[in-house]
Structure formats: structure tokens, C-alpha cells
């Protein structure tokens, strides 16, 4: 339902599609960036540094439904990346129509969403392990692939899954969802 809603017309320029949103939310969960409560929502609808809600979700019921779908998606992703073994499989943007637009290539939208989340905080890589730095560098590389990448969807998905797995193993919190749950 969320994927279809994000694919509809009427969103502001710069809003996220479902693959970009997944990458964005995974970054918030696997690499918590210390974003103030709720401040992570506006980038989803294309908000540029403010809380101006687009007409598409301006009605209170529509906004509540949108927020609930996004938070529900985030909870689903958290369950997938927290499971042992991990059940996370990256969603690649296969529904996009191929064009000259680089964001239509597999994994690029996802990786760009991940990087968009990281840009919300200036913590950088300074206190991260070498493995985490390498994982983020791999994701950044996918966001910048040339227009004709020599990699398959399966290779991109495997690389994203591996990078996320590395980051999840080191996370201290679940970002907007709070402290990690202790399971005995």
C-alpha cells in the first residue's frame, strides 16, 4: 500500500519512492544518526529543511495514515534486520521504467536513500570500525554507479545485504525506534 501511494502523482519533486525509502529507513535503523524526533519524516515527502506537509497528505487523516504506514514499514525492516539469521532482503527498484535517469538502475535509488539519511548528521565515520566504514563506502559506491553498471540485480542485492549486516552487528540503538531489545 505504501509503495503504491508513493508511486502516485501529486507528491512534491524529490519525494522518495519505496526503494529509496527502504534505504533511508535502513540507514536510520542500522546507522543511527541522532536525528531529532520526527525530523526524519520531511525528507520522505521531499521536504527541504522544513515541516511543510504536501497537499497529498495535508488532511489530518491522510497524514496519520501516511505516518503509520512509514513507521509500520520501519518496524518491519527492524524485525528483518534484527532476526537471527537476518531475514532482510533489499528491495530493488524493479518497477521503475528504464531510462536515461541513473536512479532507475537497480540499487541506486536504495543506496541514495541510505546516503540521504546519513547526510542528516555530521557524525561521520570517525567512531566507526573499519568494517563499518567499508560497508558504508560500498553503499556509497552503489549510489554512484555509472549509467551502465556491469553488475546484476543479485550482485547488488547481495552487496547491500552484506553491508547492512555489517552495520547492524555494530549498532548501539535502533535510531528512531529507540534502544535495542535484549533477547535472552
Where are these regions (language model features)?
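Domain-length accessory/inserted modules outside core catalytic folds
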Residues: 1-111, 115-184
Amino acid at each position: 500500500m505504501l509503495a503504491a501511494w508513493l508511486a502516485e502523482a501529486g507528491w512534491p519533486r524529490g519525494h522518495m519512492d519505496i526503494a529509496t525509502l527502504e534505504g533511508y529507513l535502513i540507514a536510520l535503523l542500522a546507522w543511527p544518526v541522532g536525528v531529532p524526533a520526527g525530523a526524519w519524516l520531511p525528507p520522505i515527502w521531499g521536504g527541504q529543511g522544513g515541516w511543510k506537509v504536501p497537499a497529498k497528505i495535508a488532511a489530518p487523516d491522510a497524514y496519520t495514515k501516511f505516518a503509520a504506514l512509514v513507521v509500520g514499514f520501519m518496524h518491519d525492516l527492524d524485525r528483518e534486520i534484527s532476526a537471527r539469521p537476518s531475514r532482510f532482503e533489499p528491495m530493488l527498484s524493479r518497477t521503475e521504467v528504464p531510462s536515461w535517469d541513473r536512479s532507475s538502475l537497480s540499487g541506486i535509488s536504495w543506496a541514495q536513500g541510505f546516503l540521504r539519511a546519513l547526510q542528516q548528521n555530521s557524525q561521520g565515520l570517525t567512531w566507526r570500525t573499519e568494517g563499518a566504514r567499508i560497508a558504508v563506502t560500498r553503499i556509497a559506491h552503489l549510489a554512484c554507479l555509472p549509467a551502465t553498471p556491469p553488475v546484476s540485480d543479485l550482485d547488488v542485492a547481495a552487496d547491500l545485504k552484506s553491508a547492512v549486516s555489517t552495520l547492524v552487528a555494530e549498532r548501539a540503538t535502533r535510531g528512531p525506534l529507540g534502544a535495542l531489545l535484549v533477547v535472552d
